[in-house]
Amino acid sequence: MFKLNRKKTELTDNYHRHSEAMIISCFFNPQNSVYRLKAFKLFYESIKHLNHTIIECVIGNSIPQLEENENIKRIYTENLLWHKESLLNKIISNLPAKYKYIFWLDTDVIFTNPDWIVEGVRQLQSNNIIQPFEYCIFLEKDEIKPSFSMDDIKKSFLPNAINNKVWRSFSANFVDTELWKNRSYHKHGHVGFAWGAKRDILDSVPLFDKALVGGGDHIIAHAAAGQIPHSCISNDFSAIIDIVNQWSSDFYGVVNGKIGFVNGEIYHLWHGDIEKRQYVKRHEYTPMTKDIVLRDENGLFITNEIDDVNIKRYFEEKEALEGKRKCFFRVRK
């Protein structure tokens, strides 16, 4: 089990605080990837001095990996599905009212701008939702910063065409280019890693939680921009497109296209090759999740059946594992 390291590092206390801002995240690692755990440790070192709430979701017979404290809690569920948005909604619903600005972050990212959260709150005075970064960079194994300069890359609005490890954020493109209207994921901007919104937006319309093999951020981005329907989403979520479009319309109704971003970069810490993420192929499994409607006592979707072998394989292959793979998907007795 990962225990919190109290020793200061170069990442500790680097980000500046805002009293009304709350960071929320979830962690699940049923494949027992040592690299995902390593990424979490680096991430946590960078945000542990800020207001934060994290849920570790222990799936099936997986072994808990995080030490619980007042900010890190643990819940259990049976089925291997993408529970991210359900977990985030659960956190938001239980937050004290004093937190007016919510930032939901993946637990494998590092920000270069120490004022990202303060500037994020500033952006949310005139916008309803933001991405708190302009560029995202996929790091190589064991890196904590890129091995290349961003100077020339930033001169292009299509950084991914210059270096396939770099994207501009969807929100940055929304603010100052027309690229957000493009149908190509590589051109319209990256939709993942980190978002922030006014608390009342998420209270009014909770995050879409039926993207059970992932992709919820993609739905959020196009919905916030009022792109309903959008070919990206119609193609990837055709099996559940009616509920996606209904949620998207509701979400746009409160966001109303008021989207912003924060200057700076975000580093994605390596825990598996990007080529193995199968961001497109994974949506082949969405039809398998269409009829999943049951939820457990924590509000997470369950099937009351053995996990689908194809979905299990997808989650296994997207992670970097050391040694012989073990089965972490037995149903708890």
What are these model-derived regions, one by one?
Residues 1-18, 29-36, 43, 211-333:
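C-terminal catalytic/acceptor-binding lobe
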Residues 112-215, 221-226:
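Conserved catalytic core of nucleotide-sugar-dependent glycosyltransferases
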Residues 26, 130-135, 262, 269:
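Short glycine/serine/threonine-enriched helix-capping/active-site loop
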Residues 58-99:
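Active-site-proximal specificity loops/subdomain of glycosyltransferases
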Residues 36-52:
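Short, acidic, metal-binding catalytic loop of nucleotide-sugar glycosyltransferases
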Residues 19-25, 47-54:
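Hydrophobic targeting segments
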Residues 99-112:
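Short beta-strand-to-loop acidic/aromatic patch adjacent to the donor-nucleotide binding site
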Residues 32-34, 60-66, 140:
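Short, charged/polar "capping" segments at the starts of alpha-helices
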